[in-house]
């Protein structure tokens, strides 16, 4: 009897029993499985007792499948208390459905199952390889429920739901950027400075479709809210950063909540996220000044005497504020700037118990007495021209700079919620003094607006018209107030709430101001899209004399590390997630950045394709002198501009290496324009 049972089991391992239907023929090539009552046979590939509904995935063995790559060979069997194990070969009879209602939720499921376990410990079906280059979320129906593996590492683009839902968003093609970071809604090419219209909306929408089709959710195999422990945290930093990578990703292709999601596998196939944290601020060469713009995430200190909590916008408890204060001081201490522009700090004046004085006190306690002081905008209890709960402020090191004249607050009532604040400084660290004006800005947010300020569905969010008006007023403030006060060189930094190619930045460009970072220099993540709301914009006479970098300590980190979410688990001595915006660091060298960065390794750019004589380094030496001042645009082959520089060929040659260091290796397009001169050249970055 035992012998006959064993022989039958061996036969069953290789022969489908009569009456069984291939899963591929049930799934078909359409958008949904064919409803009906079926009997299937296959191998249990994944068991998920935490999903709602609970159940397991079954996949046809290769020898028994329908052989059509356009059809999925797997589906989900709903069973409240699964009685199977991974590797079991099962025969299941039940009703197949795929619709929007429970328990399907638009995933092919088999319900009311009658299950027979034929054998256990069987080899699992091979992984179907998904090529990153051709991956499209719009074409995953053919893999529904199957074991899949990606051919190359995927990049984390969003960690917003990690704590609450145990899921992260991954992209098959690196970071996903806001469309308006590269594509101007009005201008094509994006080098234009038009700030109204919708002539180029189609390009932005097409770019977003590409973004949407390159991402997939990595789930945790559970429908439970607030999973403990939080999945996918790395062992070193206990975080999952946007920009982190997952190599050799394997899982089961599921669907739920309107999105394709990879359900994880156990053991050696479990996903591992690799993170790289910038533990130190970006390095600079010799500098005459270091400036910082930092959004301090509603820094409210209560009544300044330990009470007054919860605050209007910031910390709810004294313990929350202590954590917030410690993290912000840790970040500012490490950046060690000569001048700092602050946004989102409580607008309660400059008194002994004010938030501004409290932050200065904390910095001086950490760095030494009198290290920092604040510029006095004249508002003892509230900033002039500002009725908002928060304001812009400036602190500085008296040992590095001296104030030149009074602090200037933009005198434009009704235009700004938080008016720009400017201060002229004289350097103390040079044989002869240089002057510089520093302006801090915080434009209207994208979150709300009505009428003309409603979201126009052009990628710029709500209140864009308000921000346009603020950009125009900032230009007037610079030209009519700041420069006449004695400024020759101006750095205007802060939270503009506008990405690189949006209208407010175009308005600044149209006046001759220059954003001093390329589009992929990001500072903020929203809904899985990386962008830059924070900028350093300079007068054209500072091009070649500033080096602007961002310290990515905040936007890439999950929100649950913030002071008021993680609670006691927060590392209060860490600068990471001290805010939701990354700080902008501006290095100034009045002798020129080529001197300041002389020790930095050069980026190698080669003419592409290789000339017949062999590889040739790209150089501007051949540009005729008659071309005069050049404009150089560095672009992706698909069209989006990554950076634009202006200057003499010699100056551009010295800047090009520095400004392209951060770009990934690959093929790019250079466009040069000058007096009666125009050249387009493809280059390969090593």
Predicted features by range, described:
Residues 2-8:
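Sec-dependent signal peptide recognition
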Residues 14-15:
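N-terminal signal peptide c-region/cleavage motif recognized by signal peptidases
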Residues 19-315, 319-330, 364-366, 374, ...:
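Extended non-catalytic accessory segments flanking core domains
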Residues 33, 85, 143, 211, ...:
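Surface-exposed coil/turn segments at beta-strand junctions on protein surfaces, enriched
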Residues 44, 96, 154, 253, ...:
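Hydrophobic beta-strand positions in extracellular immunoglobulin-like domains
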Residues 62, 398-399, 429, 511, ...:
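Solvent-exposed strand-loop boundary residues in beta-sheet-rich modules
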Residues 81-82, 168, 172-176, 225-229, ...:
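Divalent cation-coordinating acidic motifs and surrounding scaffolds
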Residues 598-686:
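C-terminal outer-membrane/trafficking sorting elements
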């Amino acid at each position: 009897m035992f012998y006959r049972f064993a022989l039958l089991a061996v036969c069953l391992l290789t022969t489908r029993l009569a009456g069984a239907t291939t899963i591929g023929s049930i799934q078909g090539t359409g958008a949904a499985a064919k409803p009906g009552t079926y009997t299937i046979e296959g191998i249990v590939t994944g068991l998920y007792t935490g999903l709602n509904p609970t159940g397991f995935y079954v996949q046809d063995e290769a020898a028994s499948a329908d052989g059509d790559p356009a059809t999925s060979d797997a589906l989900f069997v709903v069973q409240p208390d699964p009685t199977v194990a991974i590797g079991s070969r099962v025969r299941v009879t039940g009703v197949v459905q795929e619709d929007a209602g429970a328990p399907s939720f638009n995933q092919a499921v088999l319900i009311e199952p009658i299950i027979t376990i034929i054998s256990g410990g069987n080899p699992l079906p091979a992984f179907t390889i998904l090529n990153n280059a051709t991956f499209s979320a719009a074409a995953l129906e053919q893999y529904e429920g199957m074991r899949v593996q990606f051919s190359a590492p995927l990049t984390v683009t969003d960690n917003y739901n990690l704590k609450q839902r145990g899921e992260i968003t991954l992209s098959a093609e690196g970071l996903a950027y806001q469309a308006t970071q590269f594509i101007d809604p009005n201008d094509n090419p994006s080098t234009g400075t038009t700030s109204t219209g919708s002539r180029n909306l189609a390009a932005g929408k097409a770019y977003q479709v590409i973004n949407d089709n390159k991402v997939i959710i990595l789930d945790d195999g559970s429908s439970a809210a607030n999973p403990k422990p939080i999945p996918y945290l790395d062992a070193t930093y206990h975080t999952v950063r946007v920009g982190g990578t997952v190599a050799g990703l394997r899982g089961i292709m599921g669907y739920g909540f309107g999105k394709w999601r990879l359900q994880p596998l156990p053991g050696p196939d479990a996903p591992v996220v690799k993170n790289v944290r910038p533990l130190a601020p970006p390095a600079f060469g010799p500098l005459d000044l270091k400036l910082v713009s930092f959004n301090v995430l509603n820094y409210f200190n209560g009544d300044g005497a330990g009470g007054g909590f919860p605050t209007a916008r910031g910390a709810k408890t004294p313990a929350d504020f202590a954590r917030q204060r410690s993290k912000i001081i840790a970040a500012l201490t490490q950046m060690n700037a000569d001048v700092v522009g602050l946004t989102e700090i409580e607008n309660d004046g400059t008194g002994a118990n004010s938030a501004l004085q409290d932050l200065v006190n904390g910095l001086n306690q950490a760095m030494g007495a009198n290290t920092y002081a604040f510029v006095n905008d004249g508002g003892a209890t509230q900033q002039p021209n500002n009725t908002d709960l928060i304001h812009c402020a400036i602190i500085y090191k008296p040992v590095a700079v001296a104030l030149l004249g009074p602090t200037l607050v933009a005198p434009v009532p009704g235009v700004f919620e938080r008016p720009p604040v400017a201060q002229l400084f004289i350097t103390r660290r040079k044989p002869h003094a240089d002057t510089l004006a520093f302006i801090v800005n915080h434009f209207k947010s994208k979150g709300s607006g009505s009428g003309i300020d409603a979201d126009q569905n052009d990628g710029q969010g709500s209140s864009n018209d308000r921000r346009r008006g603020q950009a125009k007023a900032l230009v007037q403030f610079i030209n009519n107030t700041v420069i006449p006060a004695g400024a020759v060189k101006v750095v205007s930094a802060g939270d503009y709430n506008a990405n690189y190619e949006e209208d407010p930045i175009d308005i600044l460009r149209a006046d001759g101001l220059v954003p001093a970072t390329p589009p992929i220099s990001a500072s903020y993540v929203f809904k899985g899209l990386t962008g830059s709301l924070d900028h350093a914009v300079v007068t054209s006479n500072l091009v070649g004399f500033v080096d602007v970098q961002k310290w990515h300590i905040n936007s890439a980190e999950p929100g649950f590390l913030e002071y008021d979410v993680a609670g006691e688990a927060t590392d209060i001595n860490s600068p990471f997630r001290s805010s939701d915006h990354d700080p902008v660091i501006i290095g100034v060298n009045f002798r020129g950045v080529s001197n300041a960065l002389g020790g930095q390794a050069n980026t190698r750019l080669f003419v592409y394709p290789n000339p017949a004589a062999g590889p040739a380094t790209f150089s501007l030496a051949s540009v005729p002198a008659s071309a005069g001042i050049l404009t150089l645009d560095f672009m992706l082959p698909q069209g989006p501009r990554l950076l634009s520089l202006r200057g003499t060929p010699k100056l551009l040659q010295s800047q090009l290496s520095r400004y392209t260091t951060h770009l990934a290796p690959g093929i790019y397009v250079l466009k040069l324009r000058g007096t009666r001169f125009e050249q387009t050249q493809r280059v390969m970055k090593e």
